A protein has these predicted regions:
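Asp-box/WD-like beta-propeller blade repeats and closely related beta-sheet repeat scaffolds
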Residues: 1-28
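Short loop/turn segments immediately following the C-termini of beta-strands
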Residues: 43-44, 53, 91-92, 101, ...
Length: 233
């Protein structure tokens, strides 16, 4: 890894109707699957800033925004395995927005096609959507919710990219900030920030549920988890 090629500082204030101020706060950055653009999810500004990546000169150029709803606090963006769809998780609204992604005249185009909730309406005041991942096959998207401490599984419709709920599981932990799906797609982990642990769950897609399995692993104030295959030399 070399030195820093470029740096961008987000400025301004988020839109607020409540007694709070939103300041720039980037929670997630992801390259588009074609690696032409960088998406910076700004939790405080209620938007995803899209930068063109100039690899030759090591520069980022702001060229577009995906504007979220007022006081929505976007938290994460993920792309479908075929690269045609983007999924944005909103922390304060407890929703996932689905976008069709394409490139036209060398410009990124994001077209919203679906909005779906991560929790029942009766829980919206005590819920904060926190984590989101897509399974290795691209067939399923999982979200975790803090406050109500739950995990939701959606099936991804192959032709449209749209989401259909499969099951919701109340997890035995506090603040499942992130989650990770096993490569076999039969299990997932929740990374729990407040209870300082990692729990494992077994999935039954046919009957629509998941069950806690094994013993938790204690970790002090965990924030992030990913599963990677280690290559043995």
């Amino acid at each position: 890894i070399g030195g820093i090629a470029d740096g961008i500082f987000h400025k301004g204030m988020g839109r607020s109707i409540a007694q709070r101020n939103f300041v720039p706060h980037v929670d997630c950055v992801k390259l588009t699957p074609d690696q032409k653009f960088l998406c910076a999810v700004d939790n405080g500004l209620d938007q995803v800033k899209v930068y063109r990546v100039d690899y030759e000169n090591g520069k980022l150029e702001l060229i577009d925004f995906i504007r979220g709803p007022l006081e929505s606090a976007p938290r994460m963006i993920r792309f479908s395995r075929d690269g045609e769809y983007a999924y944005i998780l909103y922390e304060l609204l407890n929703i996932v927005e689905v976008y069709h992604y394409s490139v036209q005249d060398n410009e990124p185009v994001f077209e919203k096609i679906q909005t779906i909730s991560t929790s029942p309406k009766k829980e919206e005041d005590i819920c904060a959507a926190s984590g989101m991942e897509i399974s290795k096959s691209g067939k399923y998207l999982f979200c975790s919710n803090a406050g109500v401490n739950s995990v939701v599984c959606y099936e991804i419709e192959e032709k449209t990219g749209m989401l259909t709920p499969v099951f919701t599981t109340k997890v035995n932990s506090d603040y499942p900030k992130m989650l990770a799906i096993y490569p076999d797609e039969k299990h997932y982990l929740t990374l729990n920030n407040n209870s300082n642990d990692i729990f494992s769950y077994t999935i039954d897609y046919k009957d629509g549920y998941s069950l806690e399995t094994g013993s938790p692993v204690k970790v002090d104030k965990p924030n992030c988890i990913y599963m990677l295959k280690l290559e043995v030399e």
